[in-house]
Amino acid sequence: MKRDLRSQNHEPLNCAEKSDIPYLIVYIFEPKLIQHHDTSLRHLQFIYNSIIELNKILNKKERFVDVFYGEAKNVFQFLMNEFEVKNVFSYQESGIQISWERDRLISKMFQRKGVSWKEFQRDGIIRGIKNRDQWRKKWHQIMRSPIVFNDYSVSKQVELNHPFKLPAELKTKLEDYPMEYQPAGEFNAW
């Protein structure tokens, strides 16, 4: 999971489900991104509480988002040591330079390990383009693409014991979500 924390109209989750192999749903709180000046506690709280709300939906199908705290490279190296990872499905990141550099590093690692990483576009941002030629046409294609209706099979997701737990102090801060903030979760979207 990257920025889109919904159970519906989620193309990467749809592809994972249709791949007909067991899969994990992972969200990584990355220290480098957390420490970046663009990141606020309020944003992190919204993400964390959106994951809690998403898990309420996924739990009905015995699935959940497994939360990790660590750099993506280390988390994926751990996962590849624990499992035979064949595919990774995610949305294309549209964030800051650090996330761009991270994704290039992860892409190279996946290529070396023979892992197919399919990134889906979720908005009008196209990473790495040299110019805006054809941008309008591509934007319209994405905006006109059909809505994805996710359907999840009941499948007991592996509860993985991993060393990437949220630090207790951070977890406490994330759980302390002020009532006056917009409620988290896809059913509370404005």
PLM regions: where:
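Glycine/tryptophan-enriched, flexible segments
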Residues: 115, 134-190
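Trp/Phe/Arg-rich N-terminal binding region typifying the photolyase-homology
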Residues: 1-154
